[in-house]
Amino acid sequence: MADPIITATGLTKSFGPTQALRGIDLTVERGEVLAVMGPSGSGKSTLVHCLAGVISPDSGSVVLDGTDLTALSPDQRAKVRLQRIGFVFQFGQLLPDLTATDNVALPLLMAGRSRRAANTQAIAWLDRLGLGDQADKSPGSMSGGQAQRVAIARALVTRPAVLFADEPTGSLDSVSSESVLGAMLEVVRESGTTVVLITHDARTAAYADREVIVRDGLLSGAYASVPA
Ligand SMILES: Nc1ncnc2c1ncn2[C@@H]1O[C@H](COP(=O)(O)OP(=O)(O)OP(=O)(O)O)[C@@H](O)[C@H]1O
């Protein structure tokens, strides 16, 4: 039965004269892994930033897990992001000199958990991502694939409703990329986390349940709406 966790309706967004989004309707089902594909500059990041409440569309609405993000102030949206959304980027989100455990524990400490509880959770997530024996190493001394697993653990440790992953394996070779995507998909399937995955790469998109294609600020193709 359909159980949407994100419902976006009529999204438009311009930056000066550039119309980045020109009227997008999109529904993401709870527990679904959705790939967002499209050429460079087509509007993928702008769409995902609107879906995650990072920016507000010029018109249209985004309801995420029952909350209308477009009715909230920037501060309220920031709170929703902290509590219900995880992010993984291509690189740059980890503190390279802290240990993997400290990196993953950080969002829990920011949410007010004790150091002891945060570390226990962090180590458990590192373990789930195959890094149980790397918990005391710093991402700066790890391979790119290992560091991305730490980033994924950090994004999931707060048990977000939705994980937004923007080219999460874009800086990895194909073997590491497949291994990291496989590990990520295993833990999100286990935890029932919804994933919105931006990618240029068809092999990466193949890990998703469904793909949508953004072209010139519009969704194109037959995959834009959930099959009946
Ligand atoms: N903050 C901004 N200021 C001005 N123009 C912007 C801004 N953000 C995006 N744009 C423009 O909006 C359009 C869509 O950009 P967007 O980053 O969403 O595309 P994309 O599909 O994610 O591209 P890429 O795959 O290269 O990351 C582009 O023409 C881009 O130059």
What is each residue range found by the language model?
Residues 1-12, 220-228:
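ABC-family P-loop ATPase nucleotide-binding domain
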Residues 4-214:
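ABC family nucleotide-binding domain
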Residues 211-223:
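H-loop (His-switch) and adjacent beta-strand-loop-beta switch element
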